[in-house]
């Protein structure tokens, strides 16, 4: 019909940061506060219709994300680049949209992803610290040896059947995972463990960390740790590490429309760096609030 504007479907990708403490995970659940539901509701408010947001990873309740990736489809003249401001004006304080861009309809936040990277953080001082408590496991009961923990992680590199670190309730029909890299290092009173894989099993990182601390504290041998996951002894993995220490750090794609500056590779290290910084100096004379010398 003459004068009618044709509207074509477009796919919008988002880079999302959130604090997981007050969420019941990423994925929509009835009568629960979830990240997916909050963002879907905000988008629906603008478009006047329901949408489905597809995430690269389904983080558990209490798990944080520095750069979760998701996409949704719309038939709207709104430019994809505007969704950062549109959504941030409507979302709660514990969710932040860091980037938005149009992607091909063949691109998928979950199925186009080649890898995901998680970081788990321990805080090992005996006295608690309120500024890092929401983002780390306060583990001070026994000294942790990060070099032993790294040695335990090394055999995980490659493609393995990791049923020992697979929680019940998953819809995934297999437990094969290709672990691409692991890194465990100390930063003052903090120990950071990073693991990158093509995908992760339900609850995998927290179960792995829960067993790994037994190696780091000298309660379990390297050989026994390896034997447990190689023989798929799920019953031997009794404890999952607290969710608050875990952060989805980054998702990797062959083609991605966002600049590298959106990746928070330093997250959550930036916070811990400030806590550790003893070189801060303060002027003798106080300045008015908001002013610097």
UniProtKB/Swiss-Prot annotation:
Task: Recall the GO molecular function terms of this protein's record.
Answer: RNA binding; tRNA pseudouridine(38-40) synthase activity
Q: Where is the active site?
A: 60
GO terms of biological process kind = tRNA pseudouridine synthesis
UniProt entry keywords in alphabetical sequence: Isomerase, tRNA processing
Which EC number(s) does UniProt give?
5.4.99.12
Instruction: Identify the Pfam families for this entry.
Output: PseudoU_synth_1 (PF01416)
Name the residues that bind substrate: 118
Catalytic activity, reaction form: uridine(38/39/40) in tRNA = pseudouridine(38/39/40) in tRNA
Q: How does it assemble?
A: Homodimer.
The record's comment on protein family reads: Belongs to the tRNA pseudouridine synthase TruA family.
Summary of the function given for this chain in its UniProt record: Formation of pseudouridine at positions 38, 39 and 40 in the anticodon stem and loop of transfer RNAs.
Name-wise, this protein is tRNA pseudouridine synthase A
> Which organism is this protein's natural source?
Rippkaea orientalis (strain PCC 8801 / RF-1)
């Amino acid at each position: 019909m003459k004068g009618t504007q044709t509207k074509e479907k477009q796919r919008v990708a988002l880079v999302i940061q959130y604090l997981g403490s007050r969420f019941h995970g990423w994925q929509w659940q009835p009568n629960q506060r979830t990240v997916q539901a909050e963002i879907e509701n905000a988008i629906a408010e603008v478009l006047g219709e329901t949408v489905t947001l597809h995430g690269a990873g389904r983080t558990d309740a209490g798990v944080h994300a520095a750069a979760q990736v998701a996409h949704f489809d719309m038939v709207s003249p709104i430019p994809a680049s505007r969704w950062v401001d549109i959504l941030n004006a409507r979302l709660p304080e514990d969710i932040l949209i860091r980037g938005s861009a149009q992607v091909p309809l063949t691109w998928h936040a979950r199925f186009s992803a080649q890898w995901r990277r998680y970081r788990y953080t321990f805080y090992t001082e005996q006295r608690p610290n309120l500024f890092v408590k929401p983002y780390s496991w306060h583990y001070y009961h026994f000294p942790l040896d990060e070099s032993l923990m790294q040695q335990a992680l090394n055999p995980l590199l490659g493609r393995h059947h990791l049923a020992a670190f697979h929680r019940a309730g998953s819809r995934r029909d297999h437990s094969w995972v290709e672990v691409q890299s692991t890194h465990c290092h100390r930063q003052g009173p903090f120990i950071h463990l990073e693991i990158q894989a093509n995908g992760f099993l339900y609850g995998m990182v927290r179960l792995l960390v829960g067993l790994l601390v037994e190696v780091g504290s000298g309660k379990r041998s390297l050989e026994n740790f390896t034997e447990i996951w190689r023989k798929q002894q799920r019953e031997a993995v009794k404890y999952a590490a607290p969710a608050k220490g875990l952060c989805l750090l980054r998702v990797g794609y062959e083609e991605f429309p966002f600049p590298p500056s959106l990746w928070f590779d330093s997250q959550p290290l930036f916070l811990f760096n400030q806590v550790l910084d003893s070189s801060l100096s303060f002027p003798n004379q106080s300045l008015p609030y908001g002013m610097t010398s």
